[in-house]
């Protein structure tokens, strides 16, 4: 049976309390995820970091 390679993670904004939920491949992305996404509270693009 195949093992689960994907993990559900949350991305937290560095400038507000906004959060996104996304899926990450554990085998290919071993480090913490960091993406630039749109923050609806601030109405601009900011960096979102992986939080546990």
UniProtKB/Swiss-Prot annotation:
Any Pfam family the entry gives: Ribosomal_L33
One Gene Ontology CC term in the entry: cytosolic large ribosomal subunit
Disulfide bonds: none
Gene3D superfamilies: Ribosomal protein L33
GO molecular function annotations of the record: structural constituent of ribosome
Sorted UniProt keywords: Ribonucleoprotein, Ribosomal protein
GO biological process, one term: translation
InterPro entries recorded: Ribosomal_bL33, Ribosomal_bL33_CS, Ribosomal_bL33_sf, Ribosomal_zn-bd
SUPFAM superfamilies: Zn-binding ribosomal proteins
Family from the record: Belongs to the bacterial ribosomal protein bL33 family.
PANTHER family the UniProt entry points to: 54S RIBOSOMAL PROTEIN L39, MITOCHONDRIAL (PTHR15238), LARGE RIBOSOMAL SUBUNIT PROTEIN BL33M (PTHR15238:SF1)
UniProt name for this protein: Large ribosomal subunit protein bL33
Organism: Chlamydia muridarum (strain MoPn / Nigg)
């Amino acid at each position: 049976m195949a093992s689960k390679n994907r993990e559900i993670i949350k991305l937290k904004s560095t400038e507000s309390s906004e959060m996104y939920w996304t899926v990450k491949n554990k085998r290919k992305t071993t480090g913490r995820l960091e993406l630039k996404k749109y923050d609806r509270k601030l109405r601009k693009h900011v960096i979102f970091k992986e939080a546990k």
